[in-house]
Amino acid sequence: MPGILPMKVIKVGNSSQSRIAQACDRCRSKKIRCDGIRPCCSQCANVGFECKTSDKLSRRAFPRGYTESLEERVRALEAEIRELKDLLDEKDEKLDMLSKMHSNRSRSAEPPRSTPAAEIKRDSGTPAKEDTFRVQASPLLLGVENSDSYFMGASSGRSFIETFKRKIQENGKSCTDFNPEAFLHIQGCYPLSTKLAPQSMRIPPRLFSDRCVNVYFQEWAPLFPVLHKPAFLRVYEEFVADPEKIKNNHKLTQLYLVFSIAGLSSEQPDFQQLAACETQWHKSLEAVLMDNTMLTLQCLILALMYCTVRADYKRLQYYKGIAVGLSHRLGLHQSQKRFSFGALTIETRKKVFWTLYTLDCFSAAILGLPKLLKDEDVHAEFPSDTDDENVTEKGFQPSLPGEPTRISSALALFRGSRILGKVLEKIYPAATSYELSLQQMSSLEGELTEWFENLPQHLKLNFKQDKPSTDVTGSRSPLLALAYYYTRILIYRPAIASSLGPKAAPALMSVAESSKSIVQIVQLLEERSMSFSFCLNKADILIVCGMALLYQTLGLKHDSKVLKDNEKLVNSVVKIVTKVNAPGSYDFKRIAGMLVTVEESLPQSLPTPPRQSPEACMPTPPAQQGSPSPSAVDRGAQPNLARQSSASLSETDLIVQRDKLLGMAVTPQHQQYQHQQLQQQHKNELSRARSQTSFDNLRQKAQQMRPHHRHSLSHAQVAQAALMGRTSTGTQSTPNLDYLSLSSPQSPVSPVQMRSQPHQLQQQQQQQPQPQQQQQQHQRSSIASSHSQQGQMFPQKTSTGMSTAEWEALVRSLDGGPVSLYTAIYGGPALAPLETPSSATQSSATAWGQDPWDMSSFNLGDFVPGAPTAQSVLSLSEESISSCDDVPSSDMGLNNGNMDYRNTLLPVTSAGTNNFLLDGLHGYGL
């Protein structure tokens, strides 16, 4: 009935279709759709039939997909509840700590009741005496112990590291290996490359330079708008067209500094190329340091950015002093309204100055030194919220309404830097001894929090469940949040280990929470593959944050939720700083292991059977990387070829060839087994011969295959090398894999050489069916004659890489099936080689024949019509070792009859594969 809700409606999976949980009896018996309206469904109402629903179903009331979706939702909710429970436990633990401290503090500060209200009234500007503490500047000087020693103040984190060391000693732990000078690049920065950059790297590759320019203007320029993008791109176009024509030192300095900054912040920097770029901009910058121009100041600011990321603090202070003096000389600190410049010049001057101010504040905090730009001297206005493309000398061009600009992130950072400047002046003055109060710190934190909360929505990083949200599309919002937490750490860090005692616990909690957020932000940037494009050294700030987290764990119980959370974060810090090979990473890991459980890196597991190719488990020899291989064909792309006897070397062929070459006696049981295998092979050959038609497409397909014939190591060579490692003695030399073994008949022959034998063997089987002994003798004589012909046509190189006994052990392992071969190659009991025949001799020297290119015995008439054609003939050219597919049979006047090789041609392999074909051995684990 209309207006009456139906029964329970369920949805199947994620689709839009829905149905009721159970149909009525009539609809179910007639197998028609029931809408489930109660008390009577539409189908029953149309015919006037009583609608009844009886619960006689033997099947499930709900579909399986619906139940599984409910189970998945339950699991997700359980996981979310566990996270929230851990988070609440952590918050409760912190609240308990704060409530205990607040209760003790209120009781001690409670005034007597008899005191009049007028007498207990305090001046709001005067902090309580018990909230004030005195800070004594550290007398530590770093470097050599003479007048050349240099100073690092408390804002650098050096004093906190000393405090952390004392705290560990107070807890009864040994600190003999704790060297504070191992951190913060106190010993200086390492050179980018120990090798001298070649002259060819003076001009970077186009791919490298394009990527660096793109990264710089996407990641760095929005926060540090020191360059005018259109003007720089015009210079870059000139550089790309002809690098030798760029002679201007300002242009060269800007170009190579952009390459260096962007390249250094990439995930895997090319240090040798960066060293070449660093050499170029050093030379160009030194040539223009005395020029009092805006271009020189822009170059100096770029150098400051590079030195900050590079942690080259010596050059940083040197370049900053010149840059600040030059900005004063150019009048950038003054109000720009006083000057009659064009709009583009005015905006450029504002952007350059405030970028310099930001770098001055952060570099002063890093080095622990006073700022060089004093706030009372700064009267410059902030730049307008307009991007470079919309600013000209004549004025501003309209932009899209409601669309956020790129420079908006820089404006937010400039305002945050003003607060950082106040923090440095009030919390870290240059005085030797000064007083600080918790009220003063809270006031600065309030101003900082107001700035952070008033950020535009596209620049605000939201935290969900105490973790940064992952719905970010760029690095600007995470980096602005990083600046906020870094400044918050600087505000509260002096209170740690001060004379406040337990009253400093809120400050420690603020520092630890901010350190936790910074580590999470760096993790977010790495997970999203975004650059750490900020004026801080990532390793230094992570190590200081990790020490703050370790400092907090010293006062926690072993089952504390906060301690477990800090342990995870410290392990993340260890992984990141170890990956970038930062100075002090090993010392930090050792110190962290004293306080928390540090996860050790998992050792590399032993090699396992390869699923696709052994190259994934075995490194390629250096000499083999550039040489082609005649059988370099992707095995995975040709599954049918392994099952065709004419296109692969079967086990029987290997046995016959082995018996011929090694002169071994064949037992009757062995001969009977060979005869059965030959009969089966003969049947397969006859069935395939009926479908053979022509050889027309061989040249075209071979040319398609030829570009993919360059690989590193064939399956036969991998098996041979693996067996050598288990069966050879200590006096035997390592097999030379730089060439394919073309051994003489006295030496063992690899499976690659024997690929041309099956066709001759199979033709003899088709034409001359003989008794067992005669057939085998005829095959052996045919193989011997073919080898003698090959020896005449192609002189063979003697190989000493593998002894006869070892090759015999490998071939004999084929009789045991895949398990035996796997054991021979990947481990297990060593294969016992058979008795070495007298014909197998080892030679300690490799030598070619006296006349290796003698073709006197070669005759084209030998290639008569109907003669079997070898599947692959090796070229003995020194330039390449590849199949002779370059010369088709038609060009040599050869007639292959009606033989059709279309179904046996190798398919074109992918260019990125390094797999090889070992014919006939796919079933044996290779």
Swiss-Prot record:
InterPro entries assigned to the protein according to its UniProt record, in alphabetical order: AtrR-like, Transcription_factor_dom_fun, Zn2-C6_fun-type_DNA-bd_sf, Zn2Cys6_DnaBD
GO cellular component, one term: nucleus
UniProt free text on domains: The glutamine-rich domain might function in activating gene expression.
Record-level Gene Ontology MF annotations: DNA-binding transcription factor activity, RNA polymerase II-specific; sequence-specific DNA binding; zinc ion binding
Organism listed in the record: Neurospora crassa (strain ATCC 24698 / 74-OR23-1A / CBS 708.71 / DSM 1257 / FGSC 987)
Function (record text): Positive regulator of acetate induction.
Compositionally biased tracts (Low complexity): 623-632, 669-681, 740-792
Protein name: Transcriptional activator protein acu-15
Residues annotated as transmembrane: none
Keyword field: Activator, DNA-binding, Metal-binding, Nucleus, Transcription, Transcription regulation, Zinc
CDD domains: fungal_TF_MHR, GAL4, ZIP_Cat8
Keyword Zinc among record annotations: yes
Positions of the UniProt region annotated as Disordered: 100-129, 602-649, 667-801
Biased composition (Basic and acidic residues): 119-129
SMART domains: Fungal_trans, GAL4
Subcellular localization(s) per the UniProt record: Nucleus
Gene Ontology BP annotations: DNA-templated transcription; positive regulation of transcription by RNA polymerase II
Predominant location category: nucleus
PANTHER family, per the entry: REGULATORY PROTEIN CAT8, TRANSCRIPTION FACTOR PDR1
UniProt biased composition (Polar residues): 689-703, 726-736
Pfam families, alphabetized: Fungal_trans, Zn_clus
